[in-house]
């Protein structure tokens, strides 16, 4: 609800920036940052580029996948990649800042991070969300393979250094992938 007829106060965050408070002018849509709690620290940190990529799945659907590159990324070098497996099983991989699963921190250690919005995550329609129900080792796991296979085909990925990470349902996913990955992953 607006605090007056033309202004909203909101929190905004991204993979590269923790929560800050902003004002949105409802008339001209101007956004003004009100808090700068993390500015001094963030000004000293180089974040990796975040890329939104739509990857084809094994059943020919498009899946939003976030790619986070290491800071100072050089496309002429080879990088290891980490597949981020979201928990839940029904919570989306959005532009979020996390102290627990900070994808920028992982990228800062030289990894390309692959974070797909596999089946079972909301925000992509009811069919996409419900597909996982009763099919935990099914299409959503194929979605993970689609994401890592698409990214490992890039010339800057060392396909002999692929890993997968996750907790909660993401941890279940790691164990499932460990038994079915056909030698894709090393860790």
Model-derived features: positions:
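Serine-hydrolase catalytic core recognition
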Residues: 1-187
């Amino acid at each position: 609800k607006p605090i007056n007829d033309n202004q909203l106060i909101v929190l905004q965050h991204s993979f590269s920036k923790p929560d800050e408070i902003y004002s949105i002018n409802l008339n001209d849509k101007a956004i003004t940052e009100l808090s700068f709690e993390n500015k001094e620290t963030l000004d000293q940190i180089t974040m990796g580029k975040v890329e939104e990529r739509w990857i084809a799945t094994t059943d020919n659907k498009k899946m939003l996948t976030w790619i986070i590159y290491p800071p100072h990324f050089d496309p002429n070098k080879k990088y290891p990649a980490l597949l981020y497996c979201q928990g839940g099983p029904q919570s989306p991989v959005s532009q979020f800042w996390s102290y627990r699963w900070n994808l920028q921190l992982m990228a800062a250690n030289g990894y390309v991070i692959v974070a797909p919005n596999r089946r079972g995550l909301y925000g992509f329609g009811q069919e996409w969300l419900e597909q996982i129900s009763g099919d935990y080792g099914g299409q959503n796991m194929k979605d993970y393979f689609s994401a890592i296979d698409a990214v490992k085909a890039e010339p800057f990925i060392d396909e002999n250094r692929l890993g997968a990470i996750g907790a909660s349902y993401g941890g279940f996913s790691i164990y499932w992938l460990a038994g079915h990955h056909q030698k894709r992953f090393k860790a």
